[in-house]
């Protein structure tokens, strides 16, 4: 049995992702070896191993919106394997997520929840994917270049190659590096600066990504996303 089939059998990824990730099956196996090696040397990483591939736990064919992040929050107990999401118990919320919620309220006239677990979106067709899937605690971007980028780029390329609509929401420079693999008549791209407190005032606020994504889905003949979190 191949490596990806084993991951699917264990519930680490959804079975529908096996074919899409086949070109990087050996890369994924190598990343597993790399992380085990780091741990054997006493180096920790986030998120918890069971959540590293969580973004791939939802059906490949169900993805209608892709939201790309940079890498997991580097704070212990925060990241849960989905871009911008944090564990339900985390307080205060990270600045980027607070800004996402500010724009969410402004764009949709909906009240965001008090918690930061936005995994409900994943169940409704929104893939929350980081470019880099692990990080060293306390050191942002510390696993950039370790090998995750080719894996996540392959996943995004596979999504774009389907014959179904996809709206890609690219916040910030690292996410926008994926534009070249998202060129398709069935893909629409929404981009702005990152929601980080350092950049949100330079174009994230007022960008209306949620309502624009739904408008584009309708234009492409697909059902809109139910963005409600409460």
Curated annotation (Swiss-Prot):
It comes from the Bacteria. It catalyses: Hydrolyzes single-stranded DNA or mismatched double-stranded DNA and polynucleotides, releasing free uracil. GO terms for molecular function: uracil DNA N-glycosylase activity. GO terms for cellular component: cytoplasm. It is found in: Cytoplasm. The keyword DNA repair applies. InterPro entries: UDG_fam1, Ura-DNA_Glyclase_AS, Uracil-DNA_glycosylase-like, Uracil-DNA_glycosylase-like_sf. The keyword Membrane does not apply. Its main location: cytoplasm. The active site is at residue 71. Its EC number is 3.2.2.27. One of its GO terms (biological process) is base-excision repair, AP site formation via deaminated base removal. Keywords: Cytoplasm, DNA damage, DNA repair, Hydrolase. It is an enzyme of class 3 (hydrolase). CDD domains: UDG-F1-like. Pfam families: UDG. Belongs to the uracil-DNA glycosylase (UDG) superfamily. UNG family. Excises uracil residues from the DNA which can arise as a result of misincorporation of dUMP residues by DNA polymerase or due to deamination of cytosine. This is Uracil-DNA glycosylase. It comes from Tropheryma whipplei (strain Twist).
